[in-house]
Swiss-Prot record:
Part of the 50S ribosomal subunit. Contacts protein L32. This is Large ribosomal subunit protein bL17. The gene is rplQ. InterPro entries: Ribosomal_bL17, Ribosomal_bL17_sf. Belongs to the bacterial ribosomal protein bL17 family. The keyword Glycoprotein does not apply. Keywords: Ribonucleoprotein, Ribosomal protein. Pfam families: Ribosomal_L17. It comes from the Bacteria.
Length: 116
């Protein structure tokens, strides 16, 4: 039995799931909002907030961890320049998930995740 399994599986093997979350995190930081399924949005929230927290820390080790996760190098540098000013008064909750209409093809629950 898998008691207290805290990792959302998202119907994919671990390597594909990690790559998908990295791509979604990169897209969210670049665009500011992403439309995806509700389950993916909830999984994405943890990763995006972790990257913003690293950017607020601003140390060299944090920057290297972010460079190893986010696909775009210039995006990491921009995040580390803007995040400490933008989120200085927040201790968390950098994203907002808003439910939208179900997807037309398979009626999956959809959501918009955006940076606050």
């Amino acid at each position: 039995m898998r008691h207290q399994c805290r990792v959302p599986q998202l119907g994919r093997p671990a390597d594909q799931r990690k790559a998908m979350l990295r791509a979604l995190t990169t897209q969210l930081i670049r665009e500011g909002r992403v439309t995806t399924t509700k389950a993916r949005a909830k999984a994405l929230r943890d990763e995006a907030e972790r990257m913003i927290t690293l950017a607020k820390d601003g140390s060299l080790a944090s920057r290297r961890r972010a460079l190893g996760y986010i696909y775009d190098k210039q995006l990491v540098h921009a995040l580390f320049d803007k995040a400490p000013d933008r989120y200085s008064d927040r201790k968390g909750g950098y994203t907002r998930i808003t439910r939208t209409v179900p997807r037309r093809g398979d009626n999956a629950e959809m959501a918009i995740i955006e940076l606050v």
